[in-house]
């Protein structure tokens, strides 16, 4: 339940990061060892900011922590986080015969140093699929109320020594912490749409040729739209399909004077959204375009 609440809080922080002018350059929440103290665990939330934006970044992460404590999380947020968690557990279960050595090593280390149980993925898979569907979001919200407290707080502020750069004083930080319970906040509104990414399924093409053993044991397919597909089965993973598409051309097709503008195309494509879905809606399905080059 603890990890689920932390996951949903981090999703909210990630959404804020997608704003045109976000209050921080990065932010995250977590629960674990208090700095290097193995005997003390603590909730923590941190942010990095641009110069001159320290107070705003600090206030924003405190607002989000207080919003989670005061109002909790929504059913749709929880459904999404739980589905993602169970998918990860299922993936680990399906790949149990393909686990790398470091997975076992890390489990042994956690067991020895932190007394972390290591029942095995078979037990975890069965137990999580039995428990997770029966844990309501109200239980997660109660955990967050206990986790985020207004006492026994520690603030660490670090930054460069620079002439003219002013940092908040101890008194200003203390005053901000005391304001948390009186922040003017509204419950979080989950704006993720349930409509399909494509309103109409595109008409399928045909395979016009197939050639086995083309390159490195691949099978080459040529489609009716001219696309060439190379398929290569491997036994690296038991339940994973990887796909990548390229269209040669890219920035090499533009004049040299446009290089600065063209270098930003990939970033613009990622933040522009797709159809009726903005960047926030697509946080959980993120394509990664990049340019390829060819000679003129």
Question: What is the predicted function of each stretch?
Answer:
Residues 259-267:
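Active-site recognition of the HExxH zinc-binding catalytic motif
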Residues 35-41, 121, 221, 261:
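Short, flexible turn/loop "capping" segments at secondary-structure junctions
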Residues 284-295:
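Single conserved hydrophobic/aromatic residue that forms the stacking wall/gate
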Residues 42-51, 65-72, 126-131, 247-255, ...:
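Second-shell loop/turn segments in exported
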Residues 6-48, 107:
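A structural supersecondary motif
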Residues 1-2, 7-14, 18-20, 79-83, ...:
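Proteolytic maturation boundary segments
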Residues 22-29, 67-105, 128, 152-160, ...:
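Acidic/histidine-enriched alpha-helical segments
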Residues 5, 53-60, 64, 74-81, ...:
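Stable alpha-helical elements in mature extracytoplasmic
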């Amino acid at each position: 339940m603890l990890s689920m609440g932390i996951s949903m809080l981090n999703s909210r922080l990630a959404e804020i990061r997608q704003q045109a002018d976000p209050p921080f350059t990065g932010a995250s929440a977590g629960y674990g060892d208090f700095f290097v103290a193995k005997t003390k665990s603590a909730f923590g939330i941190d942010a990095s900011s641009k110069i001159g934006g320290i107070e705003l970044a600090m206030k924003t992460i405190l607002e989000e922590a207080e919003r989670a404590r005061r109002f909790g999380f929504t059913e749709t947020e929880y459904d999404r986080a739980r589905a993602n968690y169970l998918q990860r557990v299922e993936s680990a279960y399906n790949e149990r015969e393909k686990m790398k050595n470091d997975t076992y090593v890390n489990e042994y280390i956690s067991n020895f140093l932190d007394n972390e149980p290591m029942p095995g993925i078979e037990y975890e898979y069965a137990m999580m699929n039995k428990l997770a569907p029966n844990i309501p979001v109200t239980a997660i919200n109660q955990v967050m109320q206990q986790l985020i407290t207004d006492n026994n707080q520690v603030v660490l502020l670090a930054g460069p020594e620079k002439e003219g750069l002013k940092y908040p004083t101890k008194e200003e930080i203390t005053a901000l912490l005391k304001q948390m319970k009186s922040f003017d906040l509204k419950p979080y509104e989950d704006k993720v749409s349930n409509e399909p990414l494509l309103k109409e399924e595109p008409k399928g093409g045909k395979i016009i040729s197939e050639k086995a053993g083309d390159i490195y044991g691949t099978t080459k397919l040529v489609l009716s739209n001219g696309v060439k597909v190379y398929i290569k089965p491997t036994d690296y993973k038991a339940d994973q399909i990887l796909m990548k598409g390229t269209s040669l051309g890219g920035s090499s097709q533009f004049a040299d004077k446009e290089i600065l503008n063209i270098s930003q195309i990939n970033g613009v494509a990622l933040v522009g959204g797709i159809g009726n879905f903005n960047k926030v809606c697509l946080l959980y399905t993120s394509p990664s375009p990049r340019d390829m080059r060819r000679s003129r």
